[in-house]
């Protein structure tokens, strides 16, 4: 009986113990589940409106070595488009800025601008109507590369059109932003145009952010830019504008270095001396730098006409900066993942170079500009490569817009050095930063580069070693993944090349007439050598499906307007098709313009003058028939392969 009682007690203890274990496990399980549910709830609160997680920490240029993973997104409360969810294309966006946000618009100043009237106000074109002033107008034009007489008639405080995207007009930015030094460099700049650049910045920049304006006179020869400029600055901007004068011309790069050395702002903004900023240009430009000081930014560049000072929009869709293997600056479309919201900053491999912002400390940590780069040329590549390869990032900012005068024809100013300083600059950049890819630059022009001394590169190589910068292969594959497709390192064969002879007028061939870009193409007596004629008649239907001068990637045939008799311009090559798309139809011998196949190149002789136009394609019109010196039939068989 006693044994039975002990057995029952042990059994009860086991049952109780089992129950305790079950209860404990249940309790622990419940706690774990509740904790996970709580974490899930917290995570849900950190998703943006599109269901994508917010990345709280941002490391500049900390890009995964494969492009498969999406870039870290951040919540944009002002987004104007529906960014696709994770099962679709993921957009690149910066992290959510921390801190109070503010509307930086100066609405009173904007309203005052709206009420202005007069010559050139609101960016309206101005014409000189008085025939007695035409000669003076011509002289101003030749001296400046733009219409200086019109510039003198326009107020230095003129109003501009608001060219921003609608989303930019209501967006708020961090209330706490770094202050800036704006650095203008100039050489023999038109006085009123320089003043308008200064006033433009002062009038449209929050005064609490504008620490300083630096004017660097790079050895100007004109008297008006000496004591009269000093007096004007002292009278109107005594505590804001600093003038630095180089005793002799150092060029763009040396002048910028001189300006950077006296800059006291937390961020430096470098500008050419013939610009006008748009409304609220600064906050969107420097907010990315406030988020991460290793980001450099560029505004969207609008245009001020060199002919009539009209102010109009540039590329509204934006473009990424790049280069070809002749080291010519090129532009490419924005990457699809960066173009989902056209109002947000996007990545660009190379800056245009004339307008950009950079944290002052970061600029000097990168070694500034290579001070052995002479005059101009290559500086935008050197700085862009350094920014990306040494831990930074370069962004273009659509909500920040600055208009620039792109000079027209003017009297040549001469080579200040008497040698090819641009090629030497390019070789310095290639030797330090481009690694094995430099050979593709040299092979494009071995005569220039083979025996060219790049100078002492010790300091620049030391910068790269000190900062432990990435390889150029990393840059080409991660930052500029489409460059090798758009600009093959090994020059591909042409679809057709040589002379382009008009069938109706066989003594005439397409000719640049000794002119360059922004001029109409013409016809002249055909060269004797059909496949390798003199440069002015050496054309190619290139791999980019454009008609360009062989060996001169800066000149392509471009048609701006529709028929009849549309002018065929020689224009800077952009390698993007569109107005520069051409196809050679071997059966009809037509050079067809555009992908819609409706316009053809036409040559004719009128009153003894040979002309070239684009007209609607017509069967049986021999004036629209052309013969190349050489046709690559194998390549033409696949001309449309790969086109969308």
Swiss-Prot record:
An example of a Gene Ontology BP annotation on this entry? protein O-linked glycosylation
Q: Which tissues express it?
A: Expressed in developing oocytes and egg chambers. During embryonic stages 9-11, expressed in the primordium of the foregut, midgut and hindgut. During embryonic stages 12-13, shows specific expression in the proventriculus that continues until the end of embryogenesis. In third instar larvae, ubiquitously expressed in wing, eye-antennal, leg and haltere imaginal disks.
UniProt cofactor(s): Mn(2+)
Q: Name one Pfam family in it.
A: Ricin_B_lectin
What is the recorded membrane topology of this protein?
Answer: Single-pass type II membrane protein
**Which residue range or ranges hold the Ricin B-type lectin domain?**
496-629
Name the family. Answer: Belongs to the glycosyltransferase 2 family. GalNAc-T subfamily.
* Entry comment, domain topic: There are two conserved domains in the glycosyltransferase region: the N-terminal domain (domain A, also called GT1 motif), which is probably involved in manganese coordination and substrate binding and the C-terminal domain (domain B, also called Gal/GalNAc-T motif), which is probably involved in catalytic reaction and UDP-Gal binding. The ricin B-type lectin domain binds to GalNAc and contributes to the glycopeptide specificity.
Protein name per UniProt? N-acetylgalactosaminyltransferase 4
Natural source organism: Drosophila melanogaster (Fruit fly)
